[in-house]
């Protein structure tokens, strides 16, 4: 290809169409967070779990030619906590603490033994409860999630990511856990279920075979001790995500970029969203290429980059400030 995507630009289009336009072996590290298949507005183009999986497998595959030997792809992703499964039996979950009637299943069974000819209405009158209570105690049909709703289960993503990596030619070099704020406001079941609230995600480090530079001088001794060599990264979630449904904090890509790349290297984010990865690259004197399929996020990322560039990458230009002050004219957008 004669013309490649230019560095320090954000491009609008599907990653699967634009990744082949990046110069081969030019990316030191690609760090991104894909759609999680959890029903967000920007995921509507993915009609099924199979479509989501196929899209990401293709994105990983297309990374191999553009990552330089010894470079990395770092994927921030989470398990799918509510994957609809029509084959899953209904989960029988009677929430005892929320019962409106003290009548138990044993009470109903004793009443039936005393009055075997009674129907449910007569049993309800005898027990002083509703017919629905009798039915629930006998048949266990007080189903969490609705009587007719498709049941959901947890889908672990680690094995899927590893298969994508190996098929493309990468190896899973490392994994970290991002411990974030508990998602109380986004969780409907924390008061009436054994399921846990969402408070961590993963970072999978995919390595392309080749010589890798390990430079411990990129971090201070304290940083190596506190997070560089640690498997769990404790980073607060963003303070507000009103402009984007799934922003990750600036500190997350900044740690990856500082640890795995050198100043002047090129960093890629093919799901750039609000622009956090590009801002982190600017603040650490790296170059960047960003891609997003939605024009509104491309413009948002461009504005954040303009503010970060204007601030000359100083520590004061954190992500929130960049986004709040993003009043600069948009940079060039390349339509796919």
Say what each PLM segment does.
Residues 1-18, 302-336:
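S-adenosyl-L-methionine
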Residues 1-300, 331:
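Core catalytic lobe of class I
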């Amino acid at each position: 290809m004669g013309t490649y995507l230019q560095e320090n630009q954000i491009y609008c289009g599907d990653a699967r169409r634009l990744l082949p336009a990046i110069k081969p072996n030019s990316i030191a590290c690609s760090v991104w967070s894909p759609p999680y298949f959890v029903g967000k507005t920007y995921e509507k183009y993915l009609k099924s779990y199979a479509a989501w999986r196929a899209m990401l497998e293709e994105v990983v595959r297309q990374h191999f030619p553009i990552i330089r030997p010894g470079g990395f792809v770092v994927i921030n992703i989470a398990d799918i906590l509510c994957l609809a499964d029509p084959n899953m039996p209904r989960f029988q979950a009677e929430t005892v603490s929320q019962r409106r009637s003290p009548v138990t299943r044993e009470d109903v069974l004793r009443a039936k033994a005393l009055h075997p000819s009674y129907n449910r209405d007569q049993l309800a009158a005898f027990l002083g409860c509703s017919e629905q209570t009798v039915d629930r105690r006998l048949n266990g049909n007080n189903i969490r999630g609705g009587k007719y709703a498709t049941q959901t289960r947890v889908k672990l993503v680690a094995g899927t990511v590893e298969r994508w990596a190996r098929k493309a030619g990468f190896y899973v070099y490392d994994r970290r856990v991002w411990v974030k704020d508990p998602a109380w406001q986004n969780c409907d079941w924390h008061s009436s279920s054994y399921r846990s609230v969402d408070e961590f995600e993963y970072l999978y480090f995919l390595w392309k075979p080749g010589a890798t530079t390990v430079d411990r001088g990129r971090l201070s001794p304290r940083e190596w001790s506190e997070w560089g060599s640690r498997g769990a990264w404790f980073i607060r979630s963003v303070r507000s995500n009103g402009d984007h449904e799934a922003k990750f904090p600036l500190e997350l890509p900044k740690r990856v970029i500082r640890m795995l790349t050198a100043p002047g290297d090129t960093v890629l984010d093919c799901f750039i969203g609000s622009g956090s990865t590009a801002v982190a690259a600017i603040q650490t004197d790296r170059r960047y290429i960003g891609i997003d399929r939605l024009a509104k996020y491309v413009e948002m990322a461009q504005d954040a980059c303009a503010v970060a560039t204007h601030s000359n990458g100083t520590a004061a230009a954190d992500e929130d400030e960049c986004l709040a002050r993003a009043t600069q004219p948009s940079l060039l957008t390349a339509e796919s």
